[in-house]
Amino acid sequence: MDHRDINTNMEALREVLRYKNKVAGHGFLFDDGDLVWREEDDATWRRLCDVVNALISSKRMQRVLYMDLSITKGEGHLLFVDLQGTKNRLHKEPRFRRHLILIEDFLAYPR
């Protein structure tokens, strides 16, 4: 993996979630078949936190694939990878693809 492709900014990760909903036309999470993304209460981010907390607390689980975002648990960090195909010309490519976030930073981030 080319380290120049890795972003460590939490806001950049949030922007990818916004991109998935607003530009690509598919959201990060579904709730009873409906897209879940509300800017005013940020329901998607809270649901992502639930997924991450389950991953962190699991002794056996190392990786989660949620929609087209892969979350891998490492030694003290989480790697988020946007799996949207780069050859799909119907959608504009996201600006950021990989996000390496320290677990302690993620847990401390405002929900």
UniProtKB/Swiss-Prot annotation:
InterPro entries to which the protein is assigned, alphabetical: Rhabd_NV (IPR003490)
Domain of life of the organism encoding this protein: Viruses
Family: Belongs to the novirhabdovirus NV protein family.
Its biological purpose: Plays an essential role for the viral pathogenicity.
Protein name in the entry: Non-virion protein
Organism in which the protein naturally occurs: Infectious hematopoietic necrosis virus (strain Oregon69)
Lineage: Viruses, Riboviria, Orthornavirae, Negarnaviricota, Haploviricotina
